Swiss-Prot record:
<dbReference type="Pfam" id="PF00210">
    <property type="entry name" value="Ferritin"/>
</dbReference>
<dbReference type="GO" id="GO:0005776">
    <property type="term" value="C:autophagosome"/>
</dbReference>
<comment type="subunit">
    <text>Oligomer of 24 subunits. There are two types of subunits: L (light) chain and H (heavy) chain. The major chain can be light or heavy, depending on the species and tissue type. The functional molecule forms a roughly spherical shell with a diameter of 12 nm and contains a central cavity into which the insoluble mineral iron core is deposited. Interacts with NCOA4; NCOA4 promotes targeting of the iron-binding ferritin complex to autolysosomes following starvation or iron depletion.</text>
</comment>
<feature type="binding site">
    <location>
        <position position="44"/>
    </location>
    <ligand>
        <name>Fe cation 2</name>
    </ligand>
</feature>
<keyword id="KW-0560">Oxidoreductase</keyword>
<keyword id="KW-0597">Phosphoprotein</keyword>
<keyword id="KW-0968">Cytoplasmic vesicle</keyword>
<feature type="binding site">
    <location>
        <position position="9"/>
    </location>
    <ligand>
        <name>Fe cation 1</name>
    </ligand>
</feature>
<dbReference type="GO" id="GO:0004322">
    <property type="term" value="F:ferroxidase activity"/>
</dbReference>
<dbReference type="GO" id="GO:0006826">
    <property type="term" value="P:iron ion transport"/>
</dbReference>
<feature type="binding site">
    <location>
        <position position="89"/>
    </location>
    <ligand>
        <name>Fe cation 2</name>
    </ligand>
</feature>
<dbReference type="InterPro" id="IPR009040">
    <property type="entry name" value="Ferritin-like_diiron"/>
</dbReference>
<feature type="modified residue" description="Phosphoserine">
    <location>
        <position position="160"/>
    </location>
</feature>
<dbReference type="GO" id="GO:0110076">
    <property type="term" value="P:negative regulation of ferroptosis"/>
</dbReference>
<dbReference type="InterPro" id="IPR008331">
    <property type="entry name" value="Ferritin_DPS_dom"/>
</dbReference>
<dbReference type="InterPro" id="IPR014034">
    <property type="entry name" value="Ferritin_CS"/>
</dbReference>
<dbReference type="GO" id="GO:0008199">
    <property type="term" value="F:ferric iron binding"/>
</dbReference>
Length: 164
């Protein structure tokens, strides 16, 4: 079950990496979307590595699986990418909740504590942040208005560095 979660975290990292380099393209040129998704990619990879470290500490074995290709090569718009990211984070969250339930059923308080400490709050924050981004992009008229995504890139994502 932990190996399955490792694969899902690596898949999420791979999807975010794909998004990042899509927005970095010269014909898309939304550098703060690119930076935002690259940061998300690194976070997801760190989540996978934390689980791998846990697996080794507990004497388990890591069995890496193939990482599925992202659903899209062309993410179309900032809004579409944010909606896909929101869906992805909800899937990761659901998988973590199922892993937590399994740990509870198998009487594994250590794994429960690990998931609660390192993952669940962060997932809720990510889902809220992405939900806010989707809402604000829609309010601004994205994706029909290219100006909306440009301004969101510049003023919302461009300032998120200063806040975190």
């Amino acid at each position: 079950a932990i190996n399955r979660q490792i694969n899902l975290e690596l898949y999420a990292s791979y999807v975010y990496l794909s998004m990042s380099y899509y927005f970095d393209r010269d014909d898309v040129a939304l550098k703060n979307f690119a930076k935002y998704f690259l940061h998300q990619s690194h976070e997801e990879r760190e989540h996978a590595e934390k689980l791998m470290k846990l697996q080794n500490q507990r004497g388990g074995r890591i069995f890496l699986q193939d990482i599925k290709k992202p659903e899209y090569d062309d993410w179309e718009s900032g809004l579409n990418a944010m909606e896909c990211a929101l869906h992805l984070e909800k899937s990761v969250n659901q998988s973590l909740l199922e892993l937590h339930k399994l740990a509870t059923d198998k009487n594994d308080p250590h794994l429960c504590d690990f998931i609660e400490t390192h993952y669940l709050n962060e997932q809720v924050k990510s889902i809220k942040e992405l939900g806010d981004h989707v809402t604000n992009l829609r309010k601004m008229g994205a994706p029909e208005s290219g100006m909306a995504e440009y301004l969101f890139d510049k003023h919302t994502l461009g300032h998120s560095d200063n806040e975190s």
